Regions:
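Phosphate-group recognition and catalysis centered on beta-loop-alpha active-site segments
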Residues: 1-260
Length: 260
């Protein structure tokens, strides 16, 4: 997260999970298998167990986590726990570390797969007074419904069912539906299979009703150029330095560069 900001990101997108003993942590995957030397679901491990894990164990520069590199390529391996930032961070640690950074939270799981934590997330954000400079998202419509009902003052993005409604209406030639309450953004991929999702009609329609368009996860410069030309409001990327160059190359006004 620190490196993303150093490279030019002005927001961070991250995923939230709940430990077995009820602590919210941030990690892309719902398991620790891919990044640590252990295996298991975050929901089944206590915070003490999670704190012991080396989250950089399989990391190699220029790659995501890989298991077949030469031993000397794992340049961060073994530096945790002496360097706590290489472990799995709690949500509260992230909020303390980045008080002035816009944060986008994805509630990755909910009931029945795990103990639901929608209201707990809202309570933590309220306790840090982070209700106006965050967006909460989820691929679970039920999680968003619960969160919005409990914390209507905290911004959210559209859920899957709402995105489908938008796509269907635009396909019919209808207008972008008005959004009520806490919804401030539609967060979508550029393409879904072979179908282009981010069209001029979608961008125009969303802007007409005050909804920002955020697109994930874009790492190729050519796609960044296309999206900037379409006028999207935010691009979520694993390569913020590439996006910064795209912004400079296109002479674009500043848009949100979210480091994932």
């Amino acid at each position: 997260m620190r490196q993303a900001l150093t490279l030019g990101a002005d927001a961070i997108e991250l995923d939230v999970h709940r430990s077995a003993d009820g602590v919210l942590v941030v990690c892309h995957d719902s398991t620790v298998d891919r990044t640590t030397p252990q295996v298991g679901r975050i929901a089944d491990l206590t915070i003490d167990e999670l704190r012991q894990l080396d989250n950089a164990h399989w990391w190699v520069p220029g790659h995501e986590s890989i298991t077949d590199a030469d031993a000397d390529e794992y340049i961060l391996r073994g530096r945790h726990p002496a360097e706590p930032s290489l472990g799995i961070a709690t949500l509260e640690e992230v909020l303390r570390e980045f008080p002035g950074v816009f944060l986008n939270f994805d509630m990755k799981d909910t009931s029945p797969e795990v103990e639901p934590y929608e209201t707990q997330l809202a309570d933590v954000l309220r306790s840090f007074r982070r209700t106006s400079d965050v967006i909460v998202a989820s691929f679970h419509d039920s999680a968003l419904k619960t969160f919005r009902s409990y914390a209507p003052e905290i911004h959210t993005s559209m859920g899957p069912a709402e995105v489908i409604e938008v796509a269907e209406r635009l396909a019919e030639g209808s207008s972008f539906p008005e959004q009520e309450g806490s919804i401030v953004a539609i967060q979508i991929p550029f393409y879904f299979g072979d179908v282009c999702v981010v069209t001029p009609e979608l961008v125009k329609g969303s802007h007409e009703v005050g909804i920002a368009v955020h697109v994930w996860t874009i790492d190729e410069a050519a796609e960044m150029d296309e999206l900037l030309a379409l006028g999207v409001d935010g691009i979520i990327t694993d390569c913020p330095s590439v996006l910064r160059e795209a912004l400079l190359r296109n002479g674009s006004p500043r848009v949100t560069v979210e480091g994932s």
